[in-house]
Amino acid sequence: STAGKVIKCKAAVLWETNKPFSIEEIEVAPPKAHEVRIKMVATGICRTDDHAATGNFVTPLPIVLGHEGAGIVESVGEGVTSVKPGDKVIPLFSPQCGKCRVCKHPESNLCIKNDLAAPRGTLLDGTCRFTCKGKSIHNFLSTSTYSQYTVVDEMAVAKIDEASPLEKVCLIGCGFTTGYGSAVQFAKVTPGSSCAVFGLGGVGLSVIIGCKTAGAARIIGVDTNKDKFAKAKELGATECINPLDYNKPIAEVLQEMTDGGVDFSFEVVGQLDTMMSALDSCHAACGVSVIIGVPPNAQNLSVNPMLLLGGRTWKGAIFGGYKSKDAVPKLVADFMAKKFPLEPLITHVLPFEKINEGFDLLRSGKSIRTVLTF
């Protein structure tokens, strides 16, 4: 048994930004009290990992990135009650302590114990569980899934159906849930409504799946890459438009298409100009616009208050507005019950050692989601 012992394993270490990941042998310490050590089985490559790898999302280095994954509990620290060795689990980049003001609030989900706002790169106790060549290696967003083994706090892991295929449901750890939940849980898209989705990558396509599930009548995909339109329509988009095909602002085009603007718009690009376009494209009196895309670095928007005074709602969500520990097991159960698909989002499956190839696919726009398997 490996319980209580240091485990030596492979991990993708980022020593410095804008350099390839280095596959290294690292040591993973046993879990302390209220911590869980997980043997990773599969992990997705998400744009947020790329933002960290390029330095646009500032995090301490060296680090083991990865935050969208699934695995099996190897051992648990003292006092852990929600999971046991052998359980299938998904680590949670947005934890749920259950005690803070946010966790107790019925409508909010960004637990104050998260490591998103100003990443320390540690577990809750302020220390790391990884070492390599004598150096301490930082954790990423409470998860660090680009390692054969990782250690997480108990509040940052959810037990899931033991029959679930981990190489698919790992997407529920971030990308799918972030998009799908933004439509069904956070914006609460209504039956018969009109929706516009800006950005048709993995998260944008997941928004489309959510809009369709919620019963939207019109789902308009917006992207400058028309190669993405076929997949968007396959998953529920009723039409797709390319802003480059018009000689006027895309918000005007959408307003004309939808009698003054859509009921719900979603920005899944992470650019200031598309955030403004998405806001302007929802109806001035009753529209709701949701920001999902993360801007690579902190920039300010300047907004005319008249855009909001008529009754528009403008809001943002992380992880689809879901309380993570509560929602993830239910979402996995819904997937197992065939309430939504994940397979169309996975375009590439690569062995973990080919992580740099996976990031090349992301950066070149050739993949929707690449899943790395261990």
UniProtKB/Swiss-Prot annotation:
Report the main location listed first in the record: cytoplasm
**Where do the annotations place Zn(2+) 2 binding?**
97, 100, 103, 111
* Cofactors that this protein relies on: Zn(2+)
Record has S-adenosyl-L-methionine as a keyword: no
Location in or out of the cell: Cytoplasm
Q: Name one Pfam family in it.
A: ADH_N
Q: Which reaction does it catalyse?
A: a primary alcohol + NAD(+) = an aldehyde + NADH + H(+); a secondary alcohol + NAD(+) = a ketone + NADH + H(+)
Q: Binding residues for Zn(2+) 1, per the UniProt record?
A: 46, 67, 174
Q: Which GO terms describe its biological process?
A: retinoic acid metabolic process; retinol metabolic process
Location of N6-succinyllysine modifications: 233, 339
Q: What class of enzyme is it?
A: oxidoreductase
Q: How is the cofactor bound?
A: Binds 2 Zn(2+) ions per subunit.
Give EC number(s), comma-separated: 1.1.1.1
Q: How does it assemble?
A: Homodimer.
Family the entry assigns? Belongs to the zinc-containing alcohol dehydrogenase family. Class-I subfamily.
Q: What is this protein called?
A: Alcohol dehydrogenase 1
Organism expressing this protein natively: Mesocricetus auratus
Question: Source taxonomy lineage?
Answer: Eukaryota, Metazoa, Chordata, Craniata, Vertebrata
